[in-house]
A protein has these predicted regions:
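Hydrophobic beta-strand segment of the Class I
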Residues: 134-142
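Conserved alpha-helix/loop element of class I SAM-dependent methyltransferases that forms part
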Residues: 51-52, 58-99
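A short glycine-rich, Lys/Arg-flanked "PGG" loop and its adjoining helix->strand segment in the class I
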Residues: 145-170
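A generic alpha-to-beta junction signature in SAM-dependent methyltransferases
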Residues: 78, 101, 153-156
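Beta-strand-connecting loops/turns
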Residues: 81-82, 134, 157-159
Length: 198
């Protein structure tokens, strides 16, 4: 999933140059990602792409099958190969969600240790999600509500975001469901101005 990663700095979006120093089969364990625009570099250590932030070494608690099914349904992950981002405590369900939906999942700032698989990758970041614009089908922000604004950039038009019921969304989202735990919104995509010709 390295091809989806982008420099989190504020400049024109571009791919990152990757140099790997240690791999296990197809999994990158150690290496560096470099930005060709601003020359920033980001380490890959222990299989985690580190753009800032940290990842806990604690083991993930068991997530109930009902909770995984609920997240999959709220994110509308019906197509195998869809891309979902699970943030913070939501990332505990990354492996189970990937198995259930056959989706690719990025565990962003997980609250516990997540093992990478063919469809699950771990990324640590601070205030900007280091993914390509309009590349994600769904994102569950959990306790990473500060990333809601940037979620609008990475979601495809019609992509869904699930957040705690206390969250508020910028105008780039349209709320579609709410219960006592969560609120679900849909990305409306970029607005295109229409001009009449004279």
């Amino acid at each position: 999933m390295i091809d989806l990663l982008r420099c989190p700095r504020e400049h024109e979006e571009t791919w990152l140059v990757a140099a790997f120093t240690r791999m296990d089969g197809r999994f990158v364990l150690e290496g560096t990602l470099g930005c060709p625009i601003c020359s920033a570099s980001y380490e890959i250590t222990g299989g985690v792409a580190r753009f800032g932030g940290d990842v806990s070494d604690a083991f993930a608690p068991v997530v109930s099958a009902d909770s995984v099914m609920r997240t999959a349904a709220l994110l509308n992950l019906m197509r195998p190969g869809s891309l979902a981002v699970l943030c913070g405590s939501e990332a505990n369900a990354a492996e189970d969600l990937s198995e259930l939906t056959q989706s690719r999942v990025i565990a962003l700032n997980p609250a516990s240790n997540i093992e990478d698989t063919e469809r699950v990758a771990t990324v640590a970041t601070l205030d900007r999600i280091p993914l390509a614009s309009s590349s994600v089908d769904g994102i569950a922000v959990g306790d990473c509500q500060s990333l809601i604004g940037d979620a609008a950039r990475i979601l495809k038009p019609g992509g869904r975001i699930v957040a705690p019921v206390t969250a508020s969304f910028p105008p780039a989202f349209r709320e579609i469901a709410r219960d006592d735990q969560s609120v679900v919104a849909e990305s409306i995509g970029p607005l295109i101005g229409i001009q009449r010709s004279s």
